[in-house]
């Protein structure tokens, strides 16, 4: 939308659309004529190695099967997706849609989303233990997406994931980039690099576990932010420009560009919820919320080992079915209709709160923590009114601080411009004493300020008192939130003398500092704008954002429809099955130690990289696998886990044997079973000798929930398998 003439598309937009149409035609020709030749060559094993590996079902499927699959998925999908994308562009790019739905936003709104997203990813990265991935054998790595190609390239990526020191250094680099993205330093460079590093970090963790979905949505948001002017607000980049007196976007003025960027972030958050809700309806039907199905999901996640030990859902075994139906309906409604946040303002007050409640319920009843999604809901709320209300209340209760500075001092002007940016609640009023009638000012406030004193020291007037120099800065620190953590330290004994000496030294030498912006005026605006501002009037970029949002929607729909699970792409079909059998299968882990004591074991205490969210579950499932090599992978994992654990504990507490048990609980028939089911399968592994014992179809189903004997003679050879 062009603000001046309200044209839907500019000449540049039309050229861009024609270029995209040309590229689409080239893709259709390439996909129709060239790619089938590569498929036939790869089927014969005569193509590049990575293409040959993709065709893994030669013994089952003919080459015609792969050619038909390519035609159906790629060519037909491309045509339908392109037409859908064009339709969405035509709708979302209309002036009415932009004005009523997308809206406009300030640079501070987009900058706040950047800060919050980087803070979420930084927080989740800090509690990861990426370096411990190197303790796992390479056989446990199963690439589940784009990272699979990096392992085959001669760039040393495979050596990286096998080196503990390199992984820890890479994690520190990722944390540094996320922190720099949070504060907004060199945003245009740091944000894409931070997104790339986190993409690699998360991918490595997934390759050694399973495709879990925590922290995936914040990664999507960060990728989107990398293509937006998110550094225009709440950033060091903005502060630096303001301190130099350079032009920056008006902090208080809204723009369609920031509105579109914010809308794109909202879209990548909302679409996964919609996809998950639709997946439940598509896979399980309208009655996914069947109470038996909901009980199955809750009991299964509660009984399986995780980093949290509570079992709240097991206290609900005698609760009425209506409660579980309400839980299911609430989750289904919250997810399916979450997309309304993209169209209605009132929905942005309802569904994010519902999502927070849903994720808290998942955490309490299923022991799965989606901290990233809980925190990310805050990007839908506009806290400007709250901030202004707090500022108004503080001003009425405590009053404002008047800061008198020397407008001819370059250092003073720069300092005041920066302080104005930090003044979140507008507690500070900056006055150039050279523009004041000082006699009238003294008479009105009952003060005795002299021009000579103001030339030497900045003065802060608060409640009729004058605070000069360092003591003025100390008073400012109490009023500006960003300095609140620093303020108490400024009152420690000795700090006042040191601070006054430092301030005096800088004040005496302030004219020796030469700035290009030496005498720019200071006229602070809302949210810390500088005197000289620019407007983001590049409305032509609106069409590009409409095209980008349309592409995001189409890609999400394609992934959902074709059930694509190829990191970082996912279909979001989570918990979409309908299970009304009333039976839950889960696992228990026991360990025997050098002291002879046997008890429940926590694999979460072994290797930190797989300690969260039951990430080790694919490896212990291999203990009961029937495919060649499954048991060997299980043994290698248990050996690595025992080795890592034994390094942390004292002699006598070291693990000598692990046992994995499979239990099945028929909660419909035996809801009051104190053991929550019967033992149906067990796998024991002796760490030192590598000997394994497998016992199936146990005759004695009265096993208590205590540690069973793990010695080899405890399992009869005739009842199981000895390896």
Regions found by a protein language model. Give the residues of each.
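Alpha-helical membrane-anchoring segments
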Residues: 2-443, 451, 512-723
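Thiol/selenol-based redox catalytic cores and closely related redox-interacting motifs
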Residues: 436-531
